[in-house]
Amino acid sequence: MKRCVNLDWLEVYCFEPVTGVRNADYFRSKGYTVEERDYGTRIYNEMFTIMGTDEWPLLEIRRSPKSSMTNGGIMPMNACHIRLTNRTCYYNDAAVQLQLFLDQHGFMFQRISRVDVCCDFERFDSGDYPQKFLRRYLQNKFAKLNQGRIHSHGEDTWDDRRWDSISWGSDKSCISTKLYNKSRQLREVKDKPYIKQAWLECGLIDNFYDCTKVLEDGTMHKPDIWRVEFSVRSEVKNWFVIEADGNAKKKRSVPNTLRMWAGREQLIVMFASLARHYFHFKVYKEGVRKDLLQDKELFRFRPNEETYKVDRLSSPQDEKKDLERLIAKLNKFAMTYPASEINDAVSTIVAKIEQIQLSRFAQDPYSWKELIAIQQTLAYRLQHKGIDPTSVLHSILTMLDGTVKPY
């Protein structure tokens, strides 16, 4: 079955070099664009984000501990935490990029404080649909080894009860597990284009915008993509400990260095190892010990698992910015070549954009507002050659706020 394995969180605990502090001004002096927060965190005085070469957030640094040893506290004065942004985690070599950054600026790596690895799929390798499996699990059809504490979320209607997520493990657990409907989260909480791009690259969907795919019989299908996610926290340098075969007294240490998460192949190996211990289910039978029950097979990992690679990530920008940039480029072109046929061509292109966008965003009032604003901006631009189209567009968008409703 098609599946998509990625990092979703990577954070390390480091020491700054003794040769000098690594504050926001240091990175500005090295040519980075830095966004500094006016306040720190509960543990650190400073927090700032370093932008990548594409001007999107690359990583976040928290430094200058409030409880440092020089002030009678417990943390070394040069301690810091460095976290990749969520978008950066979806690069093929995210862990390698982080290691290169640490080496380049002299940080002394201590340990991975948190790493999340996830697998997205429509169905389990066994053919089970995640929502049906989750419902049966909550009906005691299956039993899970390890992590007895659970938290589930869903929706209770008159006709049915739908479960959208479940997590195992407490807040203090070194390893926690989560199964949830990722498609629903992207629709209702926050859209992340780079995640949909990953789905497209590995074949879970065929259409980036609508998140649909064409089945073998030619019909259009909109799959619900689910995610299994393991979150690993460790207080020990280079290792984390897992329970073997559901036995709390039988533990095994697993290497936990950046090298272990360096590429897709390594991610699949680490995910499979965690799934074996923390996504291990049995077919429940009353009166029979868990370790004697029949296994419920869900994932099947092959020795040579196929992986995908992303050459360039989509930027997490909304439709408004895309449309503004497109209109600005069209108007710039029309101003450079002020011929009547150019204006006609621009009008034709915008009409085509309207046709596509109306079918895609017919229920979104913000898209309707944008399209109306584009129409009015182009009309105004054709009548007033010297006007700045961007300022007109912003003025019209502001004027239309709260007034445009979808059909």
Predicted regions and their residues:
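Structured, helix-rich domain cores that form ligand/interaction pockets
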Residues: M1-D311, D322-Y407
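Mobile genetic element proteins and their domesticated derivatives, centered on retroelements
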Residues: S314-E319
